[in-house]
From Swiss-Prot:
<feature type="signal peptide">
    <location>
        <begin position="1"/>
        <end position="19"/>
    </location>
</feature>
<comment type="similarity">
    <text>Belongs to the conotoxin T superfamily.</text>
</comment>
<dbReference type="GO" id="GO:0005576">
    <property type="term" value="C:extracellular region"/>
</dbReference>
<keyword id="KW-1015">Disulfide bond</keyword>
<keyword id="KW-0528">Neurotoxin</keyword>
<dbReference type="GO" id="GO:0090729">
    <property type="term" value="F:toxin activity"/>
</dbReference>
<protein>
    <recommendedName>
        <fullName>Conotoxin Ts5.5</fullName>
    </recommendedName>
</protein>
<keyword id="KW-0964">Secreted</keyword>
<feature type="propeptide">
    <location>
        <begin position="20"/>
        <end position="42"/>
    </location>
</feature>
<keyword id="KW-0800">Toxin</keyword>
<keyword id="KW-0732">Signal</keyword>
């Protein structure tokens, strides 16, 4: 490949790697939010606020 083709390939690879990193970060953030939400529900329910307790 000529230098321009090499640079384009390199840029595409770099962009793909950055995209993959972003997706991992999004999953991590979603996991943290889910954990915080679960904890908040347990705390809310433990202080006898029945409106926030999960119905079983």
């Amino acid at each position: 490949p000529n230098p321009l083709e090499r640079r384009i390939q390199s840029d595409l690879i770099r962009a793909a790697l950055e995209d993959a990193d972003m997706k991992t970060d999004e999953r991590s953030v979603e996991g943290v939010i889910s954990t915080i939400k679960d904890f908040a529900v347990k705390v809310c329910c433990s202080v006898s606020l029945k409106f926030c307790c999960p119905t079983a």
